[in-house]
């Protein structure tokens, strides 16, 4: 099973490391002014409720909105843009369970180097819905 890391994705598409950095810079230039206007950006961590742990991004199909998607461009994960832009603090927080029982999560993103904002937002979210305090929600061991 071949592992692919985010920096390699761009070079696998024929982009040089400099071009990959340029694209990341353009992404940051688009997103940064938006994040400066708000305390946090909140989104799901995945577009799907369940993805196999051993999914091969190169060849395993995933169904999104009823359509089979194959390849690294299928965009089921919402984390990679923020992983590419390492200056933005991101915190993943459990958000409950999908209809099939799989745990779901949200990610909280803040402006550059505002780590305290994501921690405070995550803390406040979990105070509102402390789902792990409910024994029924805990994993069976």
Each predicted region: which residue ranges?
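Glycine-rich, N-terminal phosphate-binding loop of Rossmann-like dinucleotide-binding domains
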Residues: 45
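Short helix-loop capping/hinge segments that flank enzyme active sites or metal/cofactor-binding pockets
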Residues: 1-32, 48-49, 53-54, 94-102
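Short, surface-exposed loop/helix-turn segments at secondary-structure junctions
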Residues: 19, 51-76
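Short, gly/Ser/Thr-rich active-site loops of penicillin-recognizing serine hydrolases
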Residues: 118-141
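Small-aliphatic-rich amphipathic alpha-helix that forms the alpha element of a beta-alpha
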Residues: 30-33, 69-93
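Short, well-ordered beta-strand elements
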Residues: 102-111, 118-122
